[in-house]
Amino acid sequence: MPILYFGSYILIVCLVIVCDQLTKLWILHNFQLYEVREVIPDFFNLVYVVNTGAAFSMLADVDSPWRHYFFLFIGLGAVLGLTVYTYTLRKEHFLHMVGLACIVGGALGNLIDRVSYGYVVDFLDVYVGGYHWPAFNVADSAICVGVVLYMTMTLLAGNKEKKQK
């Protein structure tokens, strides 16, 4: 894999981490825990909540000292596995790499929170009427965008290969 290609991967990972951590620091310095500020009425708020669980607060209610280490182990394993996999990609799979970099950057952003605070800082609250999507952050958004981009490019690559046969 060319250095420039993998350098792009590292750059995207770092950009995601910086954006994630800067937005979280802003929330931590400008909001009280559970404070809500309306941004777009009946659609979007900024909030300050903490998530001791995984995505959508899964396992947040499990009272075990091992839960923290479990999340760290899974997160680090995913980061290492995806980085090794990315290193094996051919350069024509650039958008696959971008998707994986977004996933890894998001995972590292949330891992930084877990190590620093023991929980993940969430602050984006999207809702319609009384239905609120669970609060999330820039790292979570990057992970979702990365998954969608990677899956889309994989499907398109599969269709391209079928047409060539």
From Swiss-Prot:
A Pfam family this chain is assigned to: Peptidase_A8
Cellular localisation: Cell inner membrane
Coiled-coil stretches noted in the UniProt entry, renumbered to this chain: none
Entry annotation: catalytic residues: D122, D140
UniProt keyword Hydrolase present: yes
Catalytic activity entry: Release of signal peptides from bacterial membrane prolipoproteins. Hydrolyzes -Xaa-Yaa-Zaa-|-(S,diacylglyceryl)Cys-, in which Xaa is hydrophobic (preferably Leu), and Yaa (Ala or Ser) and Zaa (Gly or Ala) have small, neutral side chains
Gene Ontology biological process terms from the UniProt entry: proteolysis
GO molecular function: aspartic-type endopeptidase activity
Transmembrane segments: 2-22, 39-59, 69-89, 92-112, 138-158
PROSITE patterns linked to this entry: SPASE_II
Main location (coarse class): membrane
Main EC class the enzyme belongs to: hydrolase
Cellular compartments per GO CC: plasma membrane
EC number: 3.4.23.36
Domain of life of the native organism: Bacteria
Bilayer topology: Multi-pass membrane protein
UniProt pathway annotation: Protein modification; lipoprotein biosynthesis (signal peptide cleavage)
UniProt entry keywords in alphabetical sequence: Aspartyl protease, Cell inner membrane, Cell membrane, Hydrolase, Membrane, Protease, Transmembrane, Transmembrane helix
Function: This protein specifically catalyzes the removal of signal peptides from prolipoproteins.
Similarity section: Belongs to the peptidase A8 family.
NCBIfam families associated with the record: lspA (TIGR00077)
Stored PANTHER family: LIPOPROTEIN SIGNAL PEPTIDASE
Protein name stated in the entry: Lipoprotein signal peptidase
Species per Swiss-Prot/TrEMBL record: Desulfotalea psychrophila (strain LSv54 / DSM 12343)
Source lineage: Bacteria, Pseudomonadati, Thermodesulfobacteriota, Desulfobulbia, Desulfobulbales
Gene it is expressed from: lspA
